[in-house]
Amino acid sequence: MKRFCLWFAVFSLLLVLLPGKAFGAVDFPNTSTNGLLGFAGNAKNEKGISKASTTGGKNGQIVYIQSVNDLKTHLGGSTPKILVLQNDISASSKTTVTIGSNKTLVGSYAKKTLKNIYLTTSSASGNVIFQNLTFEHSPQINGNNDIQLYLDSGINYWIDHVTFSGHSYSASGSDLDKLLYVGKSADYITISNSKFANHKYGLILGYPDDSQHQYDGYPHMTIANNYFENLYVRGPGLMRYGYFHVKNNYSNNFNQAITIATKAKIYSEYNYFGKGSEKGGILDDKGTGYFKDTGSYPSLNKQTSPLTSWNPGSNYSYRVQTPQYTKDFVTKYAGSQSTTLVFGY
């Protein structure tokens, strides 16, 4: 009896002394790097030199994020951490948080939204996983550099099961904001199983200036198993300079889907293009990149850029599914989830 009383007293003291979030765990997809594919994984560059896979905060401390201040405190630095959203995080105006390195930022099954939170890199950023998150922003935050996930430095980023929900827009309106930017020296990125929706401009990939040839070759990027819905232009994206493997994606309700611009090397395969393809808007080809498509539906035409000689099979192994399978899969499983994550391959 005395032993039991002593144990109970110690346990009660621990409840008082330990921080509440030690006992505030929430269910989240603690899947580590399961499902990782493409350039963010084990890959080679065009010279055959291998680089390590993205690991994020693997084996690091699990920290439950309850506020913007928590996010700012723990997303920076280089210590490996798995940061789990315990609450939806919201700000009344644009709030910028700088990304460090060796982090996994993951939404719980119940709480996964970042509203008006804008994540950006620095020279110390890299090896980061973003998973099971929903990005939302107010429509009035619509300037040219108002981009909720802005990656321009560092290597090894995996964006997986993330929803960029956008907002209503007018095609003739003045919105200039985008959903995602990857450019400058950011490199070795995979976007997978994610959903981009309801925005005038979608993704801008590669340095956004046709005269900055020092960025030729950046980024190496895999865009696979994603759902682009109601993006007026740039879904999958406007691409410059880098190597872009665009496979098994579904784009629907668009005016223009793939924009081929300065020195982009694009290998497209087995994508499904829905409403909008009948207007001939699948390819917006500036004639200044390199492009090849195989197996997409419907067949792509209006290509003016020369064929690319690059094939992503020289960088990593992968497999493809049919366009119809892709459409069915991503409409069911792409974006943030409230239950188990299902990965495309």
From Swiss-Prot:
Keywords carried by this UniProt record: Lyase, Secreted, Signal
InterPro entries in the record: Pec_lyase, Pectin_lyas_fold, Pectin_lyase_fold/virulence, PEL
GO cellular component terms listed in the entry, alphabetical order: extracellular region
Cystine connections: none
Influence of pH: Optimum pH is 8.0. Retains 70% of activity after 16 hours incubation in the pH range 4-11, at 37 degrees Celsius.
Residues spanning the signal sequence: 1-24
Pfam families per record: Pectate_lyase_4 (PF00544)
Major place of residence: secreted
PANTHER family given in the database record: PECTATE LYASE 18-RELATED, PECTATE LYASE 21-RELATED
Other remarks on this protein: Does not require calcium for activity.
Functional description taken from the UniProt entry: Catalyzes the depolymerization of pectins of methyl esterification degree from 13 to 75%, with an endo mode of action. Cannot degrade polygalacturonate. Also displays protopectinase activity, i.e. releases pectin from protopectin.
Protein name as annotated: Pectin lyase
Gene name, Swiss-Prot/TrEMBL: pelB
